[in-house]
């Protein structure tokens, strides 16, 4: 096993990461970094976090053998890590609990968040209700349209949802607005970022709160198959569910890590969100990473059927894992993801989120070419209730 200790003291993963923000945010980030570095080694904080994961979220989430599908494909065995079974229906809540507990310790009564698919917004609104905090969620107006049921869920949980009409009206624009709010209300507000992006300490902090996924797998897989899997596959937008399952496996060199980006309508069309495959190195939302840019270096509009993957950047640790060769990254199109969504419903009785369907589609592509003793572990990062309207629309149905 190879030791792995990134980021460095300045929040860099090789040339990626770091802190690229306005001077007005530096004090808030220094304060956050100090609080997080203290809490992450504080036994009482760790105990409280683990208690909430068990009793509020319902962890550990199980691993499940997709046996009928594996048999049909006739190759490798596919297993799912069932993050869809968490309270609120996705992996997002793991991180939200960690950051909300941190906000409470820092004496910040108001939390804000950005959201794309709405899952992070719902998870943030949920923990804000749990701890009696004021909550404001920024969401691109295009995503508000795509994810109407999640918008209503957030409102039911007591959150204020602010639609963002600038730019492409999606996740990156919501993130920009949330950053502006944070600068304005820095004294009483904690910004709960939903993915492994943003300025340090966010990429490592979100990763650390999500590594519970992979840590559970390290224990669970030997219990069910007698060893670790050969492949670990996860969808990558910003990349938090993938980092959560990848990170504990990084030292296991015989386990191949495969991230799956949104190839949208096809890589050749330019209508996709695969920043690792097609982006250039740039700075976005406070960190250096791969960014979808046009010839002038402006952030390019992205496309994916999945709102949660529709982001023009990617977490800096993924950029480093790609360059170092420790992880590989593939692309799955809208059509391939939708086919996997339908097949998963019919064959396994599980309705995955469209984000997770990208990872499942990649596993289904790989399995037939591999021998039956190989094992692919897929992070089924969320459930698909939120995507009913999108899937129905694509099938020409009106719900």
Curated annotation (Swiss-Prot):
Lineage of the species this protein comes from: Bacteria, Pseudomonadati, Pseudomonadota, Betaproteobacteria, Burkholderiales
Pfam family, one: PALP
Gene coding for it: trpB
Pathway where it operates: Amino-acid biosynthesis; L-tryptophan biosynthesis; L-tryptophan from chorismate: step 5/5
Gene Ontology terms for molecular function: tryptophan synthase activity
Keyword Nucleotide-binding annotated: no
UniProt similarity note: Belongs to the TrpB family.
Function: The beta subunit is responsible for the synthesis of L-tryptophan from indole and L-serine.
Gene3D superfamilies: 3.40.50.1100
Subunit structure comment from the entry: Tetramer of two alpha and two beta chains.
Reactions accelerated catalytically: (1S,2R)-1-C-(indol-3-yl)glycerol 3-phosphate + L-serine = D-glyceraldehyde 3-phosphate + L-tryptophan + H2O
Cofactor names: pyridoxal 5'-phosphate
Record bears the keyword Amino-acid biosynthesis: yes
EC number: 4.2.1.20
Cellular component terms (Gene Ontology): cytoplasm
Entry keyword set: Amino-acid biosynthesis, Aromatic amino acid biosynthesis, Lyase, Pyridoxal phosphate, Tryptophan biosynthesis
Organism for this UniProt entry: Bordetella parapertussis (strain 12822 / ATCC BAA-587 / NCTC 13253)
Protein name as it appears in the record: Tryptophan synthase beta chain
Disulfide bridge positions per record: none
PANTHER family associated with the record: TRYPTOPHAN SYNTHASE (PTHR48077:SF3), TRYPTOPHAN SYNTHASE-RELATED (PTHR48077)
Annotated positions of the N6-(pyridoxal phosphate)lysine modification: 92
């Amino acid at each position: 096993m190879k030791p792995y200790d990134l980021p460095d003291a300045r929040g860099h993963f090789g040339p990626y990461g770091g802190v690229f923000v306005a001077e007005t945010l530096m004090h808030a980030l220094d304060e956050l970094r100090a609080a997080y570095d203290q809490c992450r080694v504080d036994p009482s904080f760790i105990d409280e976090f683990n208690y909430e994961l068990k009793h509020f979220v319902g962890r550990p989430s199980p691993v499940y053998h997709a046996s009928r599908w594996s048999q049909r494909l006739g190759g490798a065995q596919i297993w799912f890590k069932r993050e869809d079974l968490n309270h609120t229906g996705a992996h997002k809540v793991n991180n939200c609990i960690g950051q909300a507990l941190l906000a409470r310790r820092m004496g910040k009564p108001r939390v804000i968040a950005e959201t794309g698919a709405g899952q992070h917004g719902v998870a943030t609104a949920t923990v804000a209700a749990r701890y009696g905090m004021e909550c404001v969620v920024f969401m691109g107006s295009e995503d508000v349209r795509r994810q109407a049921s999640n918008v209503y869920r957030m409102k039911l949980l007591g959150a204020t949802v602010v639609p963002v009409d600038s730019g492409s009206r999606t996740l990156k624009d919501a993130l920009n607005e949330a950053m502006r709010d944070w600068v304005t209300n820095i004294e009483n507000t904690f910004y709960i970022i939903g993915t492994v992006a943003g300025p340090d300490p966010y990429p490592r902090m979100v990763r650390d709160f999500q590594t519970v996924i992979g840590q559970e797998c390290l224990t669970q897989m030997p219990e069910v198959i007698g060893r670790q899997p050969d492949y670990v596959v996860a969808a990558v937008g910003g990349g938090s569910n993938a980092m959560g399952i990848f990170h504990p496996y990084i030292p296991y060199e015989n386990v191949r890590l495969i991230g799956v980006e949104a190839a949208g309508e096809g890589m050749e069309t330019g209508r996709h969100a695969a920043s690792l495959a097609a982006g250039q190195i740039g700075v976005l939302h406070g960190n250096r990473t791969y960014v979808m840019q046009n010839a002038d270096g402006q952030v390019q509009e992205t496309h994916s059927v999945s709102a949660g993957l529709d982001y023009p950047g990617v977490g800096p640790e993924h950029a480093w894992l790609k360059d170092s060769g420790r992880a590989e990254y593939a692309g799955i199109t809208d059509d391939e993801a939708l086919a996997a969504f339908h097949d998963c419903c019919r064959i396994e009785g599980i309705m995955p989120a469209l984000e997770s369907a990208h990872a499942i589609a990649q596993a289904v592509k790989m399995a037939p070419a591999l021998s039956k003793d190989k094992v692919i572990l897929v992070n089924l990062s969320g459930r698909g209730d939120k995507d009913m309207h999108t899937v129905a629309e694509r099938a020409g149905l009106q719900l």
